[in-house]
Amino acid sequence: MAHVAEWKKKEVEELANIIKSYPVIALVDVAGVPAYPLSKMRDKLRGKALLRVSRNTLIELAIKRAAQELGQPELEKLIDHIQGGAAILATEMNPFKLYKLLEESKTPAPAKAGAVVPKDVVIPAGPTSLAPGPLVGEMQALGIPARIEKGKVSIQKDYTVLKAGEVITEQLARILNALGIEPLEVGLNLLAAYEDGIVYTPDVLAIDESEYINMLQKAYMHAFNLSVNIAYPTKQTIEAILQKAYLGAKNVAVEAGYITKDTVEDIFGRAIRAVLLIAQNLPEDLLDEKTKELLNAQAQMAVAAAPQPTEEKVEEAEEEEEEEEASEEDALAGLGALFG
């Protein structure tokens, strides 16, 4: 039986204890992260999460041990996501907040041949600080719309040179570095996170917050409207349901002419409007003074509510009238000439 170093046993035990002590356990890839950015990340996570870098094999053993001791076999599914330079990130933060924190903590990094870009790389349109040289030919060979303008290299339009997930070539790395474009990111890449028996992967955690909030708002409004329409009372909808019921009952009472303190004004208002409608078609000598006053007031309200022509429209109308008058005069002159 092979001898296992004591420090490895101790490391596995410590890792397992960390895993058992936190509700959320994540795996992050620290491979390729320089010492200084990693140190800054530790500082940022202090008080929020515990980062423990170790060997992949020891992390795997620790996960198995913790899963067995906790009685949570689902935890072992994390092992499938161990890759690169894995490290354990233990926290009480929910996986979605943790993923957002890690993504926001990443900083841009220069292009490096052989590296995979995390997102589309676009060379923006506009002038650059590059002087004419062989690089222009290399750009054009790759389809980049570059040309010389005023002694400098200028990009004619936005051009996508790499799609997310593609690899940077040596030639493209040289061009991007010359242009000062940093397509890479330095930070901790979350590989997977475990909470309450569920393993979350980055594609699940990478949500569009604004879109998600919009979806929740729409769902809330649909549920609210449905609750009101079927008269299902809740704390949120009871007021709207009562208002709807009140207005419905009031409208029925008004239509039926049933007088109450809430309907009397509407009923008499309808009656007066009906009387005035009839009065408009009667001879004026049959109307009393009060009815005439009401008809005049109604007419004034209608005039006040009608849209007034603007000064420009009035001027245009006057110009049109002048043109019409001129054309009429021309026509009369023409007739006069015709008949001598």
From Swiss-Prot:
One of its GO terms (molecular function) is structural constituent of ribosome. InterPro entries: Ribosomal_protein_uL10 (IPR050323), Ribosomal_uL10 (IPR001790), Ribosomal_uL10-like_insert (IPR040637), Ribosomal_uL10-like_insert_sf (IPR043164), Ribosomal_uL10-like_sf (IPR043141), Ribosomal_uL10_arc (IPR022909). Residues 313-331 have a biased composition (Acidic residues). One of its GO terms (cellular component) is cytosolic large ribosomal subunit. Residues 304-340 are annotated as: Disordered. Forms part of the ribosomal stalk, playing a central role in the interaction of the ribosome with GTP-bound translation factors. Belongs to the universal ribosomal protein uL10 family. Part of the 50S ribosomal subunit. Forms part of the ribosomal stalk which helps the ribosome interact with GTP-bound translation factors. Forms a heptameric L10(L12)2(L12)2(L12)2 complex, where L10 forms an elongated spine to which the L12 dimers bind in a sequential fashion. This is Large ribosomal subunit protein uL10.
